[in-house]
């Protein structure tokens, strides 16, 4: 039985605290669309996506209106294109991306993820073709997102793939230089990538997933901040008390997301997959993960104590969300994307949040270095080395880590770049020691998996 206070609290979340469902993502398997004839493949892909996604946007809007809770983004994820399009070379992979972009546009969704390669132990012909196609594919499409998994705790890190991704990111930035390298904002490099992520740009549908499935990503950093503020005003509070407040709030936010996701799935006649518990910020006041750090007594995100606060936040979100849903998946934690969070972007601009501190914080957060803008002249080997560092954190700690980094052509440290929309804007962050990693990266090979990978 809900108390009057809980009902009023939920209404406040909707009216004043930016509570929303950040994304409902429809996963569609394309394995049955595979063909060595490109035209046949393209027709099958368009037909299947159209068949299942035709009513996705309208259904999300109807369900959101019914409950008074907006579904901000409607998205599609597909099977890894490097596998589905294994017979194709780079040119046909570019064409495949354009087919997917058209299908996403026809369905009315914001983004389509799954232009993906899984290369943690090595690269097939299809994997290499997809990666080689990325600069042109991401430059000539608007809604296609890509991810490349280069490591895992069981397999180690494919350093040849890491080096290749450093080169590829530089090429993508150059190919989209007229748009401040925005193509790089649609590419994520992972270690331990989950198979059911609803958030972009890392979403794809894994090989063990259903033919079609709904996954939902909740939001709510503003809700968490307001709950902490109320708790701090009511008397002396310890960090244990604050963690309890976060946990209870995450429960409410997750339950809302699951209700929306399950009803959308039921109306579309497809199974419900998972709720991703991640606190996903937006570039507006009151919807910031960074503001939570100030609510618990820090001057800003990035100052000493930030990693500890993030660890507590991440853990409390998982505990509360797991109690609210029997099917939790995806990334599930707290995102700290620099340009997508006004408060974090401000901390980066003032120098309180550095690249090194950001990397330290990724060891305890949901993902990794996210939406980080760096100088356009940063060498490819340095970018690869940044990726390698982040992948090592994920491999050793048996967690998902990722890098979405944007070398902005023509910009230097301290300049400002605006990507627009949910991608926000940010100062260009300096890269200490840039140019000092060339020999290390060119060694290549596979970095062995840690000893704790031997679990059988």
Swiss-Prot record:
It comes from the Bacteria. Signal peptide: none annotated. CDD domains: RNR_PFL_like_DUF711. PANTHER family: UPF0210 PROTEIN MJ1665, UPF0210 PROTEIN SPR0218. Belongs to the UPF0210 family. NCBIfam families: PRK05313.1. Homodimer. HAMAP family: UPF0210. This is UPF0210 protein Dde_3704. It comes from Oleidesulfovibrio alaskensis (strain ATCC BAA-1058 / DSM 17464 / G20).
